[in-house]
Amino acid sequence: MPKLSKRLASLVTKIEDRAYQPLEAIQLVKENATAKFDETMEAHVRLGIDPKYTDQQLRTTVALPQGTGQTVRIAVITRGEKVAEAKAAGAELSGDEDLVEAISKGEMNFDLLIATPDMMPKVAKLGRVLGPRGLMPNPKAGTVTTDLASAIQEFKAGKLEFRADRTGIVHVRFGKASFTAEALLENLKTLQETIDRNKPSGAKGRYWKSLYVTSTMGPSVEVDIALLQDIEQEG
């Protein structure tokens, strides 16, 4: 087992081995986010699903009401007038065959790729490059669309895609340590509701196994899932 750094080991001693009330868990993570940069807040959710079965897979999007605190670089593969439309809407990169060619050579200076349906046959050929990085556009994720302006604005504002990995764990960033605890809780609650709303049809038994929140350099804190589900959001 790898040794913890002295800093992390000292922080871990402040955390009890129990599930915390949601706001308390977030406050504890914030207190332990002592790195010299604004650490990213992350949620790690273990679900009772086996993604090797298609009816137990989870892949969707969540629009975090308080945003992610991160700048998202968006590339758009389209053609004709929509190339300029994507640029005008805020995409860092937009193009047709030229962008497909650049990506095929490993040039990927972006965090999210959006494509119009007519370009998907060409984008599909990039599966070997995009697939392992989780960047392949997908209609379920809202990244295959003709409404480029809306999609770009939504992802810039805090919408993000997530999926359960092969072990049934979901990893989602839900803000920055500099956010207020209340803002982070609002984002976490929205994530919980999204995961519940998109429960795979084949999920059996206990759906939520565990939920931990952490920061980039800090220790993890377990969250009481039932208490999080009981919170009612305004609006």
Swiss-Prot record:
Any one Pfam family match given in the protein's UniProt record, by short name: Ribosomal_L1
Alphabetized GO MF terms: rRNA binding; structural constituent of ribosome; tRNA binding
GO BP terms, alphabetized: regulation of translation; translation
InterPro entries recorded: Ribosom_uL1_bac-type (IPR005878), Ribosomal_uL1 (IPR002143), Ribosomal_uL1-like (IPR023674), Ribosomal_uL1/biogenesis (IPR028364), Ribosomal_uL1_3-a/b-sand (IPR016095), Ribosomal_uL1_CS (IPR023673)
Superkingdom of source: Bacteria
Keywords, alphabetical: Repressor, Ribonucleoprotein, Ribosomal protein, RNA-binding, rRNA-binding, Translation regulation, tRNA-binding
One cellular-component annotation, GO: large ribosomal subunit
PANTHER family cross-referenced by the UniProt entry: 54S RIBOSOMAL PROTEIN L1, MITOCHONDRIAL, LARGE RIBOSOMAL SUBUNIT PROTEIN UL1M
Subunit description: Part of the 50S ribosomal subunit.
Family note: Belongs to the universal ribosomal protein uL1 family.
Role of this protein: Binds directly to 23S rRNA. The L1 stalk is quite mobile in the ribosome, and is involved in E site tRNA release.
Protein name: Large ribosomal subunit protein uL1
The species this protein was found in: Synechococcus sp. (strain CC9311)
